[in-house]
Amino acid sequence: DDIWQGLKFVELNRRKAAKRWTDLLEAGLYQRLEEFWPQAYEIIGDILIVKLEDEVVSHQREIAVAMLEKHPSVRLVCADNGVHGEFRVRNLTPIISRDGDISTLTKIREGGKLILIDPTKAYYSARLSNERLGNLTSAKKLAKILDRPISVCDPYAGVGPAMASIISSPNLVDYALIGDLNPDAVSLLEQNITNFTRKLDTKIVIKLLCQDARLWKKTHDYLAKIDLLLVNLPHDTVNHIPELLPLMSKNTRSLIRGWAIINRDQ
């Protein structure tokens, strides 16, 4: 065809897409340490977190480069060193960044909402997303029963994933008492709450606290106001609920949703 005359033709060999990140490692290296390569990893926003066995730590850069190539949406690969501190936050070591940015601040999307999170500063678990969806369903049912917007309390809110869909739903909530004991979590929570409510036409009264929730009963303005109480503190839920009951509304239908881990011998 005349239209192609004068153009240079280049024949390209099509590279078969890797099914696993390990397919991108040098074959000899992979085979030599085959039993030690990480089989699982976690992606939070644009951060990939992987736990490395001692036998492959010296090859962490090769691992991270392969993972970046396998996951184009990942910006940063970090080694997982477990959790630490009073608030059990992630101890992460950045290995490699796609663009040079090694910040562990990222965003995740849940329930259609973007949530700002830093796993090195505040706890977050994607595994509880179904439970949080159940919170929204329960909140809507309770509002329908009461025939009015409800008041909500989340005393162990972290960065606010449980509030994302509830507080952003039009005409569902008119009062929210929210907090956490971790000041870093509350700082992120404040930013997230602002984003969750930005497009609402109705005003919500929001009290945001960085304090042990068991002390909230000592503040008169917080008493007998809450229709829906969320208790996401699995190891201490049973012990904390009695301290939170004074916050609950009286003489109307109310609801407590929480999770508890209880030993079989209890």
Name each model feature, range by range:
Residues 1-266:
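SAM-dependent transferase fold signal centered on methyltransferase-like domains
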